Amino acid sequence: MVLGRGLLGRRSLAALGAACARRGLGPALLGVLHHTDLRKNLTVDEGTMKVEVLPALTDNYMYLVIDDETKEAAIVDPVQPQKVLDAARKHGVKLTTVLTTHHHWDHAGGNEKLVKLQSGLKVYGGDDRIGALTHKITHLSTLQVGSLNVKCLATPCHTSGHICYFVSRPGGSEPPAVFTGDTLFVAGCGKFYEGTADEMCKALLEVLGRLPPDTRVYCGHEYTINNLKFARHVEPGNAAIQEKLAWAKEKYSIGEPTVPSTLAEEFTYNPFMRVREKTVQQHARETDPVTTMRAVRKEKDEFKMPRD
């Protein structure tokens, strides 16, 4: 994980959030956590589809997905509602849709406040534990945000109801985007809180891995530098990892996000996307992608991060 200077550690923040959520204080906590001033917003303009990258909390990302043709927008994981509404106002768009990847407080914890601040929002998600849910979705459910198509991809493992959102414009020349929450990170993947190595293999290789190679990957957290340090440990001879790590350090030093990546890139440096590669299997001392996934995830969970 990557931490801002002088900020709460990720574990401390998560523990604090969980404790407050148990006491019904989640929204109150989220309202006072404004640690993202050190990280910049980023607008990715892909023609008629724009994505505003909105840093949140310590290392989360929210994403405002804009159809420039109709000026309609969706928000992915709006944990800081006022920041979302300010961004929508800045772009002059109508926010109609909430896309929730999973129920964890740092992704879904702003839903209930947001629907109070702006009425009429459609709130999508794949888990009844998601606050303010209006539309429960399943694998391959589809919806529209203006002229943009949104396909819902079930990726259970980090949580049992985790959904990734694949967004494209029919007939458009711009590359599609996928919003992966805590399933796929830049150079990493989420912990297996409610699932298995087999499920994560299916999620990464069979569901996400079969999307177009130029698909932009927008993940839920800024964990890139530490993910790449672990990837370097797994494959020390992989030049793609070294190059991406140097690039990520430069981005982080000037406060810029390291998202998006692309699926094609992830297959070159993400050890969890590379569990079929001999170099990763040899490191794990396994010969099967699923057992390699299990071994590499266990090692990552216990990995002592170098300070470089």
Swiss-Prot record:
Residues where substrate binds: 191-193, 221-223, 297-300
Free-text comment on the cofactor: Binds 2 Zn(2+) ions per subunit.
Major enzyme class: hydrolase
Catalytic activities: an S-(2-hydroxyacyl)glutathione + H2O = a 2-hydroxy carboxylate + glutathione + H(+); (R)-S-lactoylglutathione + H2O = (R)-lactate + glutathione + H(+)
Alphabetic keyword roster: Acetylation, Cytoplasm, Hydrolase, Metal-binding, Mitochondrion, Transit peptide, Zinc
EC number(s) reported in the record: 3.1.2.6
GO cellular component, as recorded: mitochondrial matrix
Pathway noted in the entry: Secondary metabolite metabolism; methylglyoxal degradation; (R)-lactate from methylglyoxal: step 2/2
Transit peptide location: 1-13
Disulfide bonds: none
Modified residues annotated as N6-acetyllysine in this record: 116, 229
Function: Thiolesterase that catalyzes the hydrolysis of S-D-lactoyl-glutathione to form glutathione and D-lactic acid.
HAMAP family recorded: Glyoxalase_2 (MF_01374)
Quaternary structure and partners: Monomer.
Protein family per UniProt: Belongs to the metallo-beta-lactamase superfamily. Glyoxalase II family.
Protein name listed in UniProt: Hydroxyacylglutathione hydrolase, mitochondrial
Native source species: Macaca fascicularis (Crab-eating macaque)
Taxonomic lineage: Eukaryota, Metazoa, Chordata, Craniata, Vertebrata
Gene name for this UniProt entry: HAGH
